[in-house]
Amino acid sequence: MAAPTVEGAAVTALRSVLHRVRQAAERSGRTQEQIRVVAVSKTKPVSLIRQVYDAGHRSFGENYVQEIVDKAPQLPEDIKWHFVGHLQSNKAKTLLGGVPNLDMVEGVGNEKIANHLDKAVSNLGRKPLKVLVQVNTSGEESKSGIDPSSCLGIVEHVRLRCPNLEFAGLMTIGMPDYTSTPENFRTLLNCRAEVCKALGMAEDQCELSMGMSGDFEQAIEMGSTSVRIGSTIFGPREYAKKQQN
């Protein structure tokens, strides 16, 4: 009886999150439909993901290559998978080959990763892959991502040197304790303004993926177009064994 209770709780939690997203969107002068909610399902079983899928959700995220490659074939093809973890360059081919319905890679933090993804897309004959450039807005050495001062350079590299990638926007991960969240998000907003001005893009053509379980409402109020929600929907992570990227 325990499993149905947990799965029911995930669907209830999803509806609560979507309600909060709608309220935050309205406070920022937008609609819920303008905000993507990526349900991050790392360490969670396929059966639980299926429950959330059956409730109408379609955007899901995973942090580990092996996990998403294992799960994706067991789930419906109309899921839009987002890879939201740190991607090692030698895993790009495995990721793309194993997940035909991979919609986006969030977290291109250097030219090497961009080049490997571009080559993998070309070799597999896939349509151009949407990517977000990851910006390290908190300055933490433990985090991936480009320094804000180098953001424009890698965006230009993706747009000019990677014909099989589609630059879709920017992403960042705030501080774990959310102490500097407003500053982190403001930095990403500044990066977007710089990129759009330099490239002649409208700002609404450049997505902002910022905001997680503990700060997604504030992120939306500050302009986020995509939030990554894991534990608030699925419950605490279950690390039965060490995950490998």
What are these regions (language model features)?
Residues 75-77, 242-245:
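Short low-complexity, flexible loop/linker segments enriched in glycine and/or proline
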Residues 224-242:
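Gly/Pro- and small hydrophobic-enriched strand-loop and loop-to-helix capping segments
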Residues 2-214, 222, 234-236:
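Conserved alpha/beta-domain cores
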